[in-house]
Amino acid sequence: MNRISFLKTSALGTFAIGGIPTLNLFSSVPFQNLKISITPWSLMRTGFGGNDPQGIDVFDYPAVAKSLGFDYIDHEMFHFPKKLNEGDIEKMVSNCQKADVKSAVLLTGGVGDIGDADIKKRKKALATYKYWVDIAQKLGCKAMRNVCGEFITIPHKEKLTYAIEGVKELGDYAGSKGLDLLIENHNGYSSDPEWMIDLMENVNLKNVGVLGDFTNWTLERNPDTFYPDPYKGIELLSPYIRAVSAKSETFSSSGEETTTDYKKMFEILQKAPHLEFAGVEFSGNTITRNKGVQLTKALIEKVIKELK
């Protein structure tokens, strides 16, 4: 089943709060503290300077984001120069200041697994991502996102044990730098809400939470199997969610995203007391990237206004 069929089917279907401290203050007004950010994949579809005729230069990203109406931007490790240096980081910080945008979340992953069963590989991954925590701090981010449990190579409970160790260590390090660590549902075990809940409850660090992705629910490959209801998945994770990836691809003539019911999703997210960022992630190709980003942002703003 492809993503569109899966989400259309799931849309017909449709919490115990762990010891997580607030990024937001509890409020009777839904989404009072929510900030809408843009994720770089919306505008840049290749990494490390790869060929992307419709893309932009990563250092122009803050100004372009501002021109599209954003005050907050996410960063992606693969969009920075492959040989990153202090000058590059300083240039990005300066360009953010010039554009009057703030950094929200640094997205990392794909260069090692902090929950690897092999201790040498796990330690190497942790060292790599601690380096990126330092960069997130220099960029002025509130949080860094990482992935864990994406690839199924060992049994469910065994993977959880190593994931707890890795997330605790990286979370402790992020906390020492004043950052939150967010683990995303990014396929594999991480797309099983119960596995993620077990991970959060066992890690139990004040600065560790979840980045909830609207569409990443692939449990296994060949054949593809999915967590059956993305809305229920977000609902189960909502006590731990501090940011979401608001995915979009195609829109109806009335401006509704055609694969995700945004109003239903944000109704559920009213139960997420720590939600601070909604990151616009447009991946479509039938309209311009700028238009897709603007439609997604407008849709989020519309449903939030309706829910208030």
In which residue ranges do the predicted regions lie?
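Active-site-proximal loop/turn and secondary-structure-junction residues that shape catalytic pockets
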Residues: 42-44, 77-79, 109-112, 148-152, ...
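Active-site groove signature of glycoside hydrolases
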Residues: 136-156, 177-186
